[in-house]
Amino acid sequence: MAKQEQAPDRANDVFALTSFLYGGNADYIEELYAKYEDDPNSVDPQWRDFFAKLGDNADDVKKNAEGPSWTRKNWPIAANGELVSALDGNWAEVEKHVTDKLKGKAAKGEAKGAAGTPLTAEEITQAARDSVRAIMMIRAYRMRGHLHANLDPLGLAEKPNDYNELEPENYGFTPADYNRKIFIDNVLGLEYATVPEMLDILKRTYCGAIGVEFMHISDPAEKAWIQERIEGPDKKVAFTPEGKKAILSKLIEAEGFEQFIDVKYKGTKRFGLDGGESLIPALEQIVKRGGQMGLKEVVLGMAHRGRLNVLSQVMGKPHRAIFHEFKGGSYTPDDVEGSGDVKYHLGASSDREFDGNKVHLSLTANPSHLEIVNPVVMGKARAKQDLLVGRTRDDMVPLSERAKVLPLLLHGDAAFAGQGVVAECLGLSGLKGHRVAGTLHFIINNQIGFTTNPAFSRSSPYPSDVAKMIEAPIFHVNGDDPEAVVFAAKVATEFRMTFHKPVVIDMFCYRRFGHNEGDEPSFTQPLMYKAIRAHKTTVQLYGEKLIAEGLVTQDDIDRMKADWRQKLEGEFEAGQSYKPNKADWLDGAWAGLRTADNADEQRRGKTAVPVKTLKEIGKKLVEVPKDFHVHRTIQRFLDNRAKMMETGEGIDWATAESLAFGSLAVEGHPIRLSGQDVERGTFSQRHTVLYDQENQNRYIPLNNLQKGQAIYEAINSMLSEEAVLGYEYGYSLSDPRALVLWEAQFGDFANGAQVVFDQFISSGERKWLRMSGLVCLLPHGFEGQGPEHSSARLERYLQLCAEDNMQVANVTTPANYFHILRRQMKRDFRKPLIMMTPKSLLRHKRAISTLAELSGESSFHRLLWDDAQYNKDEGIKLQKDAKIRRVVLCSGKVYYDLYEEREKRGIDDVYLLRVEQLYPFPAKALINELSRFRHAEMVWCQEEPKNMGAWSFIDPYLEWVLAHIDAKHQRVRYAGRPAAASPATGLMSKHLAQLAAFLEDALG
């Protein structure tokens, strides 16, 4: 009796002492409290006693239980019979659900009390409370079990101090309760289970060699799928004997390859996989399981660590080719030009077959700039998905179709946590114009970043935490348990192929040697490297496990190692005389294209379009469906455009662009235009996507030109430069027949993607034999808008120009813009195009063209003559060539400033010559033009400061040209703004004063 009297107090003490009332259970307790305030007899006596002691205001209690006023009515999703509410801690719902089920079972005689009789009401309440406590404990394991998993192969990681949150005592269970069967409604795949049975499944599932983070996912279907896949008495990590031997074989190959290179090329950098060999069988599993689920192609991106191993053991690159490169040989045939790159940056492609499923693998070439290859891989994958489906209209490609191409990214732990482009790519993952049906991220977490410990390289517990923002499931796994790693890879692949979402594998391993093979890691990590030196390799540990299981003998393992070594020796010998027989860069989608020849030739391509075709396209550009409500201002815009097409006069910049896009689409070239606000255009000039003013439906005239045309996509991108530009570059690598454009909101912001310009666009062809026809539209022009809205920093791109690597242009007429865009697709080679695009010229009365200039025999002009030379109705008539006293050369918008100032002053002996394409520099064409004015003074005029713009780049070229024509003045004089630290002034008065000064200098 005394014991009974003591029970409520003891329960209260337990409640008070434990974290049973921690935040996750608060809602449940508040709802119970509200029930108690309505009717004290409706709750369990122990709870009644507990609440009686609190003495809170009844109205407050009820308000708290109702939750905040802004709570969504339909959230959380109701229980579906499998206790989904337990995922979200909706305990009141759980208790009601369990009680109802138990009552039903008692009524049918399925649930019996201790005496074997049907359950009484009191026993049902007790059983329901047991169930709720058990489910709370299960939820704690799902939420926090990963923190207790055995993840670190070295055993150096500190255990979390979590106040025993996973202990059964925390949930009101004592050892006396351990033998009692508790109703858990199939939550762990069991209807009834004792506490030890639950713990056995929970510890194995959540605290073994795999730690799963998935409770941050809000989609119940995704969460339920993961639980269903890994929880239950029959869900152990299990492999057949053949599967285990296959894993051992791959580990021996991975380890043996690294050891072989270490012996043959002592001290040479290879960035070995030593310590992370489980990666290799895991990648095989991803390809194999993906292939079974419909995967056709994998696009890989990875850093240097383990790259050679992936190339040889996963991609199937011949070992002799790698050994040939190690001894300093080229990776391309002798007749292919290129500056080359180090071994651990090179790409490759191959086909692998598993179980009759053929999967194409391609590894993307990348620079040492960590993680910047990620968006490139995603862009490549997106283009391959589009090609696979054969898109012709702006229809959504189903994600199940996109899922046939998998972007697979391998990361280092420090880089994944540290590089901003990682978060940008995760941000792109769900966007309509950039999604790829989920990227699989594999972190090789060797728990160190060069010499920096994780505590100094990230603020979060795991390197993978950034992926939580997109609710990606995360599988942490111990790299010394190859079976667990392969299992995690399998489940991750299945999740991606099922839900078409990104997924992360975080493999804890170690780096057996230094950052590179010439490095001494003990300087900075003495304790870690002491542990590593004493630690057995993954092959040794797994070999011992299989020997203990009786699957193999030590002799078997020794023989496997010897056979592999013998194979490598044979390949090593073959590598001495190996000759690459062919560069693979013009295969597949690139078949029919070639490398470009002499940079100074015209290389115009046939870019003109018949007037009839242009008028047909123009007619469609201004048509909208009958029931479509266009904005009044847009209707005026369309009416003006219709007038231009009718008269063939006054073609403005945006119309020329739409005609270029439309004519290419009709000829079968898809157009992909991406960037911030590109649908409308930063300056409200483009309007290629129209919105119905009453229902916001979209209409895209460029996708309604004719049957069978190619697609036009305008993608308002996320507010990122680096990832989006990298993505579009990647897209251009996979589809040379698509015109891919990226437009900066203002050219000034393009330097947020400087790495992509430096490492890929300007140098990718020379380093890796990879051509790209990407177009970058960078709004540029000094109009008094201040230092961040004036300059795309033209000088930066010109400084990168050499060896015919890309084109840089600053065109001044809509016709030239039309031709340069079409030229990108109308030649049999591809080069990136960096284009300074106008702002004020978009609506300038002089910056117009005629349809005649887009048709007939017209083409792109690298140099443009003075308008006064040909237009008879201009304000001034120029003197004959011999009487011209000065030639002012310029590029871009400043031409119109000079032209109008000259007209205002009535000057007729100064000739204005525009350089429309700055690189490749049109030297021969300029010799022809300037030969007309041998005796004239030569001036270069620009609106940019002297240390910016084209001056430093063009000065030596102009000097060379003047020497060739034997000009009277052998040096060009500079006219423009003086050198400055900031590109432009923010004061309009100062801007106008500077403009007046350099116009006086150029024309005075």
From Swiss-Prot:
Requisite cofactors: thiamine diphosphate
Catalytic activity: N(6)-[(R)-lipoyl]-L-lysyl-[protein] + 2-oxoglutarate + H(+) = N(6)-[(R)-S(8)-succinyldihydrolipoyl]-L-lysyl-[protein] + CO2
Molecular function GO labels: oxoglutarate dehydrogenase (succinyl-transferring) activity; thiamine pyrophosphate binding
Disulfide bonds: none
EC top class, as a word: oxidoreductase
One CC-aspect GO term: cytosol
Enzyme Commission identifier(s): 1.2.4.2
Keyword Oxidoreductase: yes
Pfam assignment, any one: OxoGdeHyase_C
Transmembrane stretches, start-end: none
SUPFAM superfamilies for the chain: Thiamin diphosphate-binding fold (THDP-binding)
GO biological process, one term: glycolytic process
Subunit structure: Homodimer. Part of the 2-oxoglutarate dehydrogenase (OGDH) complex composed of E1 (2-oxoglutarate dehydrogenase), E2 (dihydrolipoamide succinyltransferase) and E3 (dihydrolipoamide dehydrogenase); the complex contains multiple copies of the three enzymatic components (E1, E2 and E3).
Protein role: E1 component of the 2-oxoglutarate dehydrogenase (OGDH) complex which catalyzes the decarboxylation of 2-oxoglutarate, the first step in the conversion of 2-oxoglutarate to succinyl-CoA and CO(2).
Family the UniProt entry places it in: Belongs to the alpha-ketoglutarate dehydrogenase family.
Protein name as catalogued: 2-oxoglutarate dehydrogenase E1 component
Organism (species): Brucella suis biovar 1 (strain 1330)
Lineage of the species this protein comes from: Bacteria, Pseudomonadati, Pseudomonadota, Alphaproteobacteria, Hyphomicrobiales
Gene that specifies this protein: sucA
